[in-house]
Amino acid sequence: MKTSILILAAGLGTRMKSQKPKVLQELCQKSMILHILKKAFALSDDVSVVLSHQKERVEKEILEYFPKTQILEQDLQNYPGTAGALRGFEPKNERVLILCGDMPLVEQTSLEALLSNNAKLNLAVFKARDPKSYGRVVIKNDSVEKIVEFKDANTQEKEINTCNAGVYVIDSRLLKELLPLIDNNNAAKEYYLTDIVKLAKEKDVMIKAVFVDEDEFMGINDKFELSIAENFMQEKIKKYWMQQGVIFHLPQSTFIGADVEFVGECEVYENVRIEGKSKIINSIIKSSSVIENSIVENSDVGPLAHLRPNCELKNTHIGNFVECKNAKLNTVKAGHLSYLGDCEIDSGTNIGCGTITCNYDGVKKYKTIIGKNVFVGSDTQFIAPVKIEDEVIIAAGSTVSVNVEKGALFINRAGHKMIKDYYYKKFQK
């Protein structure tokens, strides 16, 4: 049975206390709404998102990554609440999966399990450790009797720990029939989607409660809950990669972005941060190193190294306190204390301590190209744009501002001056 998916993302998110819309808050470097959309499009090609607060800003991010998403706008002034969000929604398929935009931890497999039940109305529920302000679910004889919003619950109902996860699967025709019957006769004067359970019950529709994991279906409302969710996601990310063969030393101290990829046998030491769409292939990343949107293949990086965006390393050693940016290094050794930015360095080249590619003149960035089997002495500055051909020796302390031909020795140092007995003349009278 084909499914249409609707994601509710129109809320103000006031508890987040941020100028950024709640669904654009990030977990592991990806906004909440993008986490949800990735799973939604894996299940259906008919995905809609309901927006209101800062609609244009959220819509821009959604369509950049998922251009096939249908965008709807909720009239919060006249139709507030979760049921109000569904006005104007026209599903293309036989049933609808309704998700919340602030639930980025939900796994695709859990949604597939929810969809595997053929009841006309399925409701995701969980046993809460602390029910807090969740809506309470009353179940009798394996069927949901009703959902009571916390604000409207009596003392007895507040004792119930079976809570509404806010995720529904409903027959499209049933949704179309019941939605106009929902009113706002409640304490908040909102149109609650939870009332659809009561209306379905009145029509003798079987309502199936599907129990799910509380942590996975956690809604995120403030920065504290955001941090809890990110920790949870980090654990899942690292567990997955460890199961694929990656070694993590003290994994609780590392950060791995949601889009990072490991291939082959990799090893990651403590306090490492790997971000963006970085790809690590058969490599070792040593302690306290940072890698941003870079590819590292058959190489070792660190400790205390920094690969800024667009680096490509192959068969290369990057040592401590080396920073690279937009650098392509193939079979290169850069052991310590160097900055290699906007450069291409070829195989067999050794970069001495304190080497700098001076790539910026205050207006533009320029490239340094270094060929094969070049030996670069310590404390060398390359004033880009500059090209060093193969099999060159650059003497320590040189400032290189001209191209160097193949096989040459390049020396450029300030003249030396030594004054005999100067110390005694200055300090001993």
UniProtKB/Swiss-Prot annotation:
CDD domains, sorted: GT2_GlmU_N_bac (cd02540), LbH_GlmU_C (cd03353)
Residues annotated as binding Mg(2+): D102, N221
Cofactor mode of binding and number, as noted: Binds 1 Mg(2+) ion per subunit.
Entry EC no(s): 2.7.7.23, 2.3.1.157
Protein name: Bifunctional protein GlmU
Function description: Catalyzes the last two sequential reactions in the de novo biosynthetic pathway for UDP-N-acetylglucosamine (UDP-GlcNAc). The C-terminal domain catalyzes the transfer of acetyl group from acetyl coenzyme A to glucosamine-1-phosphate (GlcN-1-P) to produce N-acetylglucosamine-1-phosphate (GlcNAc-1-P), which is converted into UDP-GlcNAc by the transfer of uridine 5-monophosphate (from uridine 5-triphosphate), a reaction catalyzed by the N-terminal domain.
Ranges in a coiled coil: none
Protein family per UniProt: In the N-terminal section; belongs to the N-acetylglucosamine-1-phosphate uridyltransferase family.
Pathway as given in its UniProt record: Nucleotide-sugar biosynthesis; UDP-N-acetyl-alpha-D-glucosamine biosynthesis; N-acetyl-alpha-D-glucosamine 1-phosphate from alpha-D-glucosamine 6-phosphate (route II): step 2/2; Nucleotide-sugar biosynthesis; UDP-N-acetyl-alpha-D-glucosamine biosynthesis; UDP-N-acetyl-alpha-D-glucosamine from N-acetyl-alpha-D-glucosamine 1-phosphate: step 1/1; Bacterial outer membrane biogenesis; LPS lipid A biosynthesis
NCBIfam families named in the record: glmU (TIGR01173), PRK14359.1 (NF010939)
GO biological process: cell morphogenesis; cell wall organization; lipid A biosynthetic process; peptidoglycan biosynthetic process; regulation of cell shape; UDP-N-acetylglucosamine biosynthetic process
Keywords linked to the UniProt accession: Acyltransferase, Cell shape, Cell wall biogenesis/degradation, Cytoplasm, Magnesium, Metal-binding, Multifunctional enzyme, Nucleotidyltransferase, Peptidoglycan synthesis, Repeat, Transferase
Compartments where located: Cytoplasm
Catalytic residue positions: H336 (proton acceptor)
